[in-house]
Amino acid sequence: MNRESRTVTLVVSIASATTTTLPAFLTGALAVVIRHHLDLTTTQLGLLVSTFFAAAIPFSLLIGPRVKLLGVERLMRIAVASTVLSLLTIALLDSTFLSILVSLILAGAANGVMQPTVNQFLVGRIKLKGQGLAFGIKQAAVPLATLLAGLAVPLVALTIGWRYGYLGAAIFGIVTFVAIPTTNKGSTEQGDRTATKVVLGPLIILAMGMAFGAGAANAMGAFLVSSNVHSGFSPGTAGYLAAIGSASSFITRIMSGFFADRRRGNHLTVVAAMLMIGAVGYLLLSLCNPELVVFAGVLAYAAGWGWNGVFNFAITKTHPGSIAHATGITQAGLYCGSLLGPSLFGVLVDHYSFAVAWQVNAVFAVIGAIAMWIGRRALRAELAGRDLGA
């Protein structure tokens, strides 16, 4: 694959993943405005975001093993088109809690299809020696989505109206849909390997680690703006602060992927260490101290939510012929955590405080780190004799 084709692959990957992630994080970031417009509680807002991830779980598990059969590019286009439909529904129709809920169910299903599919898309087009960076760039789609969502508060929601945030995301999705290739003309040998055995036990443990780590991170993505407002910042400033945190995660994901290509193994150990550092960031956020918000947010985002690319790279290296299947399983763990994390966070805020919610987030990150370490040991035991660098 030449440099131009590789660049197109990376751009399409991050644009596709960003499009199908935007509905959840737009809803979280715009919550401070939507809440007053539709008279919603914090618990209801958490439920909206969680429903998105709940809808993704069955599709990630069902589509993962069937991606090659159904067609990678075809599935990507279907997922993006479904997301655009959900965004336009929220933007153009008279929204209620129920209508937004239904729209986010459709968007969540599309995201469940997209994640294992775009993993296969990447590995089918990028050579092994560059896949760590490729996954880092692809996983940077999530902080890019939260960055755009954070900027949507001061630049869109507080100026021309919150619905225009969804409309802008829909336009981005339409451009992405057009950019997705109709056929795979850049396939690499890596993408066409014979299916390898999926080691289910270790993958389930690692999926649990994903659940706890991502549950904490997605709660942060959904509620950091609201938490910053509670700490005394204006909604506009709170949105900018969230965007700064998202930018740090964006950079970390790309750089961690870059270094993963230059490191022989131990990728899951790095993931566990990053989760532990992220827990410190959550604890600092629990202080609700305006002077610490920027540092705590950057630490929590960069470490607590910067590990996903390295994680997926490790899974693809240990399952070179069953990439979509294996990452579909671990992605389901991420969705489970993302389902429960924002909902629990919202309940804790409503019944206790933001401080308690951030402390629970820190505990979740620590549990996730422990699960990653245990899962790595189990995976290495199962794959003894195979030099695949977990």
Q: Language-model features: where?
A:
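Helix-to-loop junctions at the C-terminal end of transmembrane segments
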Residues: 59-71, 253-265
